[in-house]
Curated annotation (Swiss-Prot):
This is Probable transcriptional regulatory protein LI0269. GO terms for cellular component: cytosol. Belongs to the TACO1 family. SUPFAM superfamilies: YebC-like. It is found in: Cytoplasm. Residues 1-23 are annotated as: Disordered. Pfam families: TACO1_YebC_N, Transcrip_reg. Keywords: Cytoplasm, DNA-binding, Transcription, Transcription regulation. GO terms for biological process: regulation of DNA-templated transcription. It comes from Lawsonia intracellularis (strain PHE/MN1-00). One of its GO terms (molecular function) is DNA binding. NCBIfam families: PRK00110.1 (NF001030), PRK12378.1 (NF009044), YebC/PmpR family DNA-binding transcriptional regulator (TIGR01033). Its main location: cytoplasm.
Length: 246
């Protein structure tokens, strides 16, 4: 597994998606606020364009999108949000990256340190694990909607890197610089994407046993449940036979 959808699949199987809908709206709005700091016109701001597309994919209302843009550009208050990437280790020595959007850096780092230590993890210095990951564009498609051949052809034509079988879904990766070009090519081809985002992809995975897997999942869930966290990435590789028992 490529490592991106594996964690999403665990969440789906554990029935966490519906419970997270409210937080997904908050995360999407924060990403728009941060992106809009570099300009409120999506045509000239690729990150904002991607953030709006992601927000629309989860049905964030148009007025919420527009309000977030105004906050990011400084037209309205509420845009004082800082983006930070924290690093650390989880049970079994797995690497953990925590993407945070916060209006209070001191509060966030103190809370994250508590969550990590409470769940068998520890915070690391800047650069301690980030070198194990690469930021890439990630496009996810329903397995039942497209064949491997169809998506491989579309990926090559769009200039994407590779295609991964992630169980219930197909996952296409591309370089960060090509993300918007590839997304626009897929949209032009009328391909329906389950999601399209920039994500930190682990270069190598660490396999764990079932007891460690339970601890890692508990930590990752606790981190994702924290309000200031936008995304959590890990290089944990949980075999399917163990994942089925979680």
């Amino acid at each position: 597994m490529a490592g991106h959808s594996k964690w999403a699949n665990i969440q789906h199987r554990k029935g966490r998606q519906d419970a997270k809908r409210g937080k997904e709206f908050t995360k999407a709005a924060k990403e728009i606020i941060i992106a809009a700091k570099n300009g409120g016109d999506p045509s000239g701001n690729p990150r904002l364009r991607a953030a709006i597309a992601a927000a629309k994919s989860i049905n964030l209302p148009k007025d919420k999108i527009e309000a977030a843009i105004r906050k990011g550009t400084g037209q309205d208050s509420g845009g004082d949000i800082t983006e930070i990437m924290y690093e650390g280790y989880g049970p079994g020595g797995v690497a953990v990256l925590i993407e945070v959007a916060t209006d209070n850096r001191n509060r966030s780092v103190a809370d994250l340190r508590h969550i990590m230590s409470k769940n068998g993890g520890s915070m690391g210095e800047s650069g301690s694990v980030s070198w194990m990951f690469e930021r890439k564009g990630v496009f996810v498609f329903e397995k039942t909607a497209y064949s491997e051949e169809e998506l491989m052809e579309a990926a090559l034509a769009a200039g994407a890197d590779d295609l991964h079988d992630e169980g219930d879904t197909w996952e296409i990766h591309t370089s960060m610089s090509d993300f918007n070009t590839v997304r626009e090519a897929f949209e032009s081809d009328k391909l329906i994407m389950q999601s399209a985002e920039l994500a930190m992809i682990p270069q190598n995975m660490i396999s764990v046993d079932i007891e460690t897997a339970k601890k890692v999942v508990k930590l990752l869930e606790a981190l994702e449940d924290y309000d200031d966290v936008q995304q959590v990435y890990s290089n944990v590789d949980i075999p399917d036979e163990i994942m089925n028992e979680l």
